[in-house]
Design a protein with these regions (language model features):
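SAM-dependent methyltransferase catalytic-core segment centered on the flexible catalytic loop
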Residues: 97-155
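C-terminal catalytic and target-recognition region of SAM-dependent MTase-like enzymes
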Residues: 169-221
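Conserved Class I SAM-dependent methyltransferase catalytic core
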Residues: 133-181, 188
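SAM-dependent nucleic-acid methyltransferase catalytic core
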Residues: 1-104, 116-129
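A short acidic (Asp/Glu
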Residues: 83-86, 100-108, 168-173, 197-198
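Structural motif
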Residues: 91-93, 159, 217
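Residue-level detector of short, conserved catalytic/binding motifs and their immediate flanks
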Residues: 88, 156, 214
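Generic recognition of flexible, low-complexity loop/linker segments
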Residues: 77-80, 145-149, 202-205
Length: 221
């Protein structure tokens, strides 16, 4: 608390990285380890106790001096993009499914804001009761929101990451992008996240076979 404000972001970034590692989850914040209904480090089987309970140590960051200007916004991207200048390249990584990030990573927000007065409600994960979904989390609105985003992006190139398990079918996503320029589709080798250690091997293999990650590079014309 005595650290000058200009230095706090550097240490806070390091702390958030460590908190995302040393926590009572499987590595994904969709649920916390429990023994029955009561939270317990590592759950009933004491999984990953070393990772969860080992001390947090902040390492010296790698800092790069450059003259690039950075702009950060919490606004709706579909609104914000209408007011940005012409850019060479824009990269988008929209939500793939119905689960908004905010309900998973709310604890990181608490650490980031360092608000000790936040009341954690008695919900499934302790997530805030006032969380909101993005249009990209909706099977009804995702496609139209995505097309509006591409149409309003003032950039020479647009790079998008998505997978074939997302709300927007890959064929539909390609059709939208091809309306606005020349499109290159790039397959990405990607090992899917092991959702839980107890999942059967055959189910895990099926999951790996089903999910394919892609990059889409659009040269907007």
């Amino acid at each position: 608390e005595t650290l000058p404000d200009k230095y706090k972001p550097f240490l806070l970034a390091l702390l958030l990285v460590e908190v995302s590692i040393h926590n009572n989850t499987s590595g994904q914040f969709s649920a916390f380890y429990k023994n029955g209904k009561i939270g317990q480090y590592g759950g009933a089987k004491n999984i990953d106790l070393k990772r969860i309970t080992s001390p947090i140590t902040l390492e010296m960051p790698n800092l790069i001096k450059n003259s690039c200007k950075s702009f950060i916004s919490k606004n709706d991207t579909n609104v914000w993009v209408k007011n940005i200048p012409k850019l060479d390249l824009v990269y988008y990584d929209p939500p793939y499914n119905k689960h908004p990030y905010s309900i998973y990573y709310f604890l990181l927000n608490i650490v980031n804001n360092w608000d000790k007065n936040v009341e954690i409600p008695n919900t499934t994960r302790g997530q805030p009761l006032n969380w909101e979904k993005s249009l990209y989390n909706s099977s009804i609105h995702a496609k139209s929101a995505f097309e509006e985003l591409i149409k309003n992006t003032n950039a020479t190139y647009i790079l998008i990451s998505y997978n074939n398990g997302g709300i927007i079918p890959i064929d539909d996503l390609e059709k939208i992008l091809k309306k606005y320029g020349n499109l290159e589709k790039i397959n990405v080798e990607h090992k899917t996240y092991n959702k839980m250690k107890g999942i059967s091997n055959y189910k895990r293999n099926l999951e790996k076979e089903k999910i394919q990650e892609y990059f889409f590079l659009l040269h907007k014309t």
